[in-house]
């Protein structure tokens, strides 16, 4: 196929596509394109005759020419759309003339092609375009003409506003926020009792403690298996067993969620008993039991901690706590594999300690009178608790030794009764009665020793630890105030340096900026290299002046923002310590000391009452024996 035939077939295909799409065409454009076709045909004939390029080259060039013609035609149609109404008569005449004049050359006029339907008139095409352009305007007008929404009643508006305010408040609430409205409405009573030795999945022994809760708090009831109290009962009582590791998870979670709240300390796990292997002795287990029970009591009387979701999950009898602790174990094992040094060493704590050590002492002085008074009270209370602990530790040892002595004394009296067994039965009976009384006295002393050692002394030691923990909270506040004072001094220095630099430069330019270097030749000629070096230095210093001033202003702005942030944190922490944490701690401390002293008094009263009853019986028996002998 020659290049002319190829061009004709391409033109036919193009015209078929135009006819099927019913796109209006201008015959004047066709006449122009026909002229270009003739010239291109002649050029293609020349190229074929001279054999300059192969047929593939002519095919690609013809295809490119057709694409250019199509684009030219589209552009011309877009340009002539606006003039369709004016030139309708001329276009009809041009169509007839072009159809007659170009019937031999234009393949669209060939008799071989089917008769095409009449294309749309230019007026109709213009109307279609106008309708398409008017669609977005109509949509906009319809939106603007929509009727106003019906106003809801006043109560509905108020409810919607209250809901929106509540949502905003929930969004503004911090992560550790707890709703304390349930603290006054509902009651929670939890005790830790009955330690028991169990085996885990790896057959390793451990001690579990029975945590019994009685409550009507709905946030706790929904976590339990029962979901609600029994019919006719107001409170629901349920129990669950927890081991020491569960208490440790609770403590760490509360410490992370409430860093500015006084969290009671747990009994230390790094005890000497763990090295000796005596971790399952009755003495050690009961000491830990009383400490854990006191830990729970402190949480119960705290408005925030008692209403925390993690504590509710801890005391509930559902299986969600096991899932929670398992996920924590997996997270800890996957996140930290740097060994014991990486787990124990706290980089932030080391940095804070070093920085506070290097900080001048003038910033470490406390100025708040309330904080100073609280700190003094805590230190005095701590010293008194330590003194009581030392005194009762000595008394405990004395009681323990005295109990052993009475035990040995009763054994010796019992031996005397066995010696006198064959000689005098009356003396033997009297020795047995007296030996039993001494044995009872020894057991009573041992019970007194056990109570002082496992309960009373542990309460004093725990309260002393609570004092230290509260002192640490005050120390956190002091560290924040020290940081704030250091930041304020640093800001003052920056402002002074900035004002000094601007004052020195204001004499020449008034704006605090250095003037550009002047090419003044000094009397000393140091050579081209020295002069060029000095010029470069002056230029660099001048170019850096604006940047350095911008950096200084940004630094001052950042310092002011940080100071405002630290001031707010410090104010909130100070108010919380004075108005919330210390009154709560003082109330708990008074109750615990009172209960400990009352418990010690009750134990002593019981001890001496039992001795009076026992020795009264012994005295009556001995007097009766003497009367019989008389």
From Swiss-Prot:
The keyword Transferase does not apply. It comes from the Eukaryota. Residues 32-49 have a biased composition (Basic residues). Residues 187-321 form the PX domain. SMART domains: PX. Residues 50-60, 130-143 have a biased composition (Low complexity). This is Sorting nexin-4. The lineage of its organism: Eukaryota, Fungi, Dikarya, Ascomycota, Saccharomycotina.
């Amino acid at each position: 196929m020659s290049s002319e035939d190829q061009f004709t077939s391409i033109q036919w295909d193009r015209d078929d596509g135009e006819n099927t799409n019913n796109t209006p065409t201008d015959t004047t454009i066709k006449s122009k394109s026909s002229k270009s076709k003739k010239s291109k045909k002649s050029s293609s004939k020349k190229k074929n005759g001279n054999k300059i390029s192969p047929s593939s080259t002519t095919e690609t060039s013809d295809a490119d020419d057709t694409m250019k013609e199509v684009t030219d035609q589209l552009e011309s149609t877009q340009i002539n759309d606006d003039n369709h109404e004016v030139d309708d008569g001329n276009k009809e005449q041009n169509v007839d003339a072009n159809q007659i004049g170009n019937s031999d050359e234009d393949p669209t006029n060939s008799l071989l092609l089917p008769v095409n339907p009449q294309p749309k008139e230019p007026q109709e095409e213009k109307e279609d375009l106008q309708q398409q352009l008017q669609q977005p305007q109509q949509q906009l007008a319809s939106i603007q003409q929509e009727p106003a929404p019906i106003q809801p009643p006043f109560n509905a508006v108020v409810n919607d506003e209250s809901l929106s305010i509540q949502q905003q408040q929930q969004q503004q609430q911090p992560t550790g926020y707890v709703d304390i409205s349930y603290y006054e409405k509902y009651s929670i009573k939890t005790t830790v009792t009955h330690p028991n030795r169990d085996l885990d999945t790896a057959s390793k022994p451990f001690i579990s403690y029975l945590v019994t809760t009685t409550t009507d708090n709905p946030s706790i009831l929904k976590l339990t298996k029962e979901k609600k109290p029994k019919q006719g009962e107001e409170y629901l009582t349920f129990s669950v067993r927890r081991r020491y590791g569960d208490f440790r998870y609770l403590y760490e979670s509360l410490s992370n969620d409430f860093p500015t709240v006084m969290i009671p300390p747990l009994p230390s796990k790094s005890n000497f008993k763990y090295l000796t292997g005596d971790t399952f002795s009755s003495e050690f287990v009961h000491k830990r039991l009383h400490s854990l029970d006191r830990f729970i009591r402190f949480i119960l009387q705290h408005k925030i901690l008692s209403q925390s979701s993690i504590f509710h999950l801890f005391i509930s009898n559902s299986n969600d706590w096991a899932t929670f602790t398992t996920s924590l174990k997996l997270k800890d094992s996957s996140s930290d594999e740097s060994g014991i040094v990486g787990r124990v060493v706290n980089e932030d704590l080391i940095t804070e300690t070093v920085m506070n050590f290097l900080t001048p002492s003038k910033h470490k002085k406390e100025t708040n009178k309330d904080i100073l008074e609280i700190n003094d009270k805590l230190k005095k209370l701590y010293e008194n608790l330590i003194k009581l602990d030392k005194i009762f530790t000595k008394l405990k040892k004395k009681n323990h030794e005295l109990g052993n002595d009475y035990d040995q004394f009763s054994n010796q009296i019992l031996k005397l009764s066995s010696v006198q067994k064959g000689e005098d039965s009356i003396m033997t009976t009297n020795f047995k009665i007296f030996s039993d009384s001494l044995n009872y006295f020894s057991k009573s002393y041992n019970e007194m020793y056990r109570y002082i050692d496992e309960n009373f002394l542990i309460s004093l030691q725990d309260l002393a630890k609570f004092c230290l923990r509260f002192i640490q909270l005050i120390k956190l506040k002091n560290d924040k105030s020290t940081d704030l004072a250091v930041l304020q001094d640093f800001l003052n220095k920056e402002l002074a340096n900035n004002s000094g630099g601007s004052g020195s430069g204001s004499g020449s330019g008034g704006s605090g900026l250095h003037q550009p270097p002047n090419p003044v030749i000094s009397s000393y000629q140091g050579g081209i290299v020295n002069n060029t070096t000095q010029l470069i230095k002056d230029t660099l210093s001048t170019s850096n002046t604006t940047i350095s001033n911008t950096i200084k202003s940004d630094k001052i702005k950042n310092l002011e923002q940080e100071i405002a942030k630290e001031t707010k944190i410090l104010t909130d922490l100070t108010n919380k310590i004075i108005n919330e944490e210390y009154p709560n701690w003082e109330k708990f401390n008074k109750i615990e000391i009172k209960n400990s002293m009352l418990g010690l008094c009750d134990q002593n009263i019981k001890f001496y009452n039992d001795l009076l009853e026992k020795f009264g019986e012994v005295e009556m028996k001995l007097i009766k024996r003497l009367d019989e002998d008389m």
